[in-house]
Amino acid sequence: MKKIPVLEIFGPTIQGEGMVIGRKTMFVRTAGCDYSCSWCDSAFTWDGSAKDDIRMMTALEIWEELRELGGSRFNHVTISGGNPALIAAIEELLAVFHENGIKSALETQGSRWQDWFLDIDELTLSPKPPSSGMKTDFEKLDFILNNLKAHNSFSLKVVIFNNKDLEYATNLHERYPEVPFFLQVGNTDLVEEDGRGLLKQLITDYEKLIDAVTESDRLNNVRVLPQLHTYVWGNKRGV
């Protein structure tokens, strides 16, 4: 079996974002990313700060650790990053999940196609807005979304930090009007240890985003979400 670079395996917990928000799940966090977003809340996956924590694991080794941690208390696994779409060997992990009746979710920015996208039960494409400092390759994104037409469950999600991000998201929604579309408020404070102080700011920003969306006649078919896990655990890792 091929090896997958793994930084974290944890759970059961709940999914805090996107189309499966609130879903009970286990997490497998992979290392490596082709982006370097300015506000990334998991920069340790690509900035070298956690390079000594990376474990090269086969799909079966990952599955065994998931079972050790979660026992029979889960039937869903979220594959996170970094950008797991960089890793061809994820295909083998998905095969193990399917053999054991486990559903899967994965989020990627839409910069790389993998044939195994079609094997993901809940796939989120999350192109990065202007505040990230990254630039969307719409030719690649068009290619990916065209390939996903046969997929039963996928969506678009954009994290919003400012008005330019919201305009980017609005244009993206109008480019792909048939794709389920989620807006998520961004976390502007990645170092705040006091969850109560962070929660106050998150709620304020969430309310502002709701107000902006309700005032728009171009965003009538979107869902506006918080980053749920930050409401409960703040910036804590491994939850």
Where are these regions (language model features)?
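N-terminal pre-triad scaffold of radical SAM enzymes
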Residues: 2-39, 43
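Conserved beta-strand segments that form the floor/walls of ligand-binding pockets within enzyme
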Residues: 5, 27-29, 41, 78, ...
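Conserved Radical SAM active-site core
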Residues: 7, 24, 36-121
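A short, flexible beta-alpha/helix-coil linker loop
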Residues: 12, 45-47, 188-190
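Solvent-exposed, flexible loop/coil residues
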Residues: 18, 23-24, 50, 232, ...
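Conserved residues at beta->alpha junctions
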Residues: 31, 81, 160
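Conserved AdoMet/S-adenosylmethionine-binding subsite of the radical SAM
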Residues: 74, 85-239
